[in-house]
């Protein structure tokens, strides 16, 4: 089960705990208090996506890599001996500096399907709760989750809205990568759109990027030392990787296999 699958399984148990409380107290007030408690325990849920602060692209010498049916450039050398592919959908790219990139491929609508399975709700009810477009793609559902904050659950909210928004706040708090504490940024390329969790200016130990297309998503985790002589990974270097991602057509993959 993927990380999001495990996350959503936790959410499935919320309903029973809420039912007893609701017998004695008002719905909206209870959910407003609960949402603010989540915000106090997990301050990251108060963050929402903003535009990327640096769109420059590193021009440093590097390499073009090809894994899992995709190719992209990195502005660094690669340690081929330590680079490993632990499964059919992920690869760990080792860099001579000691840093690494975890690259993985995600099937279409994995997040949406996990939500439907874990919440035990049917698609029609979720569409009524969150809107027609919410379950259209993993990108649209992720965007919905990231845009919600505890402040959107008010004491005078309609019961259905309060329940739905609180559920999103809880999902957001549990699913958020550690890097998201320093910022959440929108990502756009020619073929993908998604989000970056983490501001490289704060030199986090890890920084995640998720990008989505109609035929599935890609995830990059940039891992680095948080101190020492190795230069920190910069936004321009991350942009070099993300902005050069492209899917390799099947015909091209076949042709490469013949050479």
Label the model's feature ranges.
Residues 2-115, 122-123, 204, 215-216, ...:
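N-terminal targeting sequences that direct proteins away from the cytosol to non-cytosolic compartments
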Residues 128-215:
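Signature of long, low-cysteine stretches enriched in small and polar/charged residues
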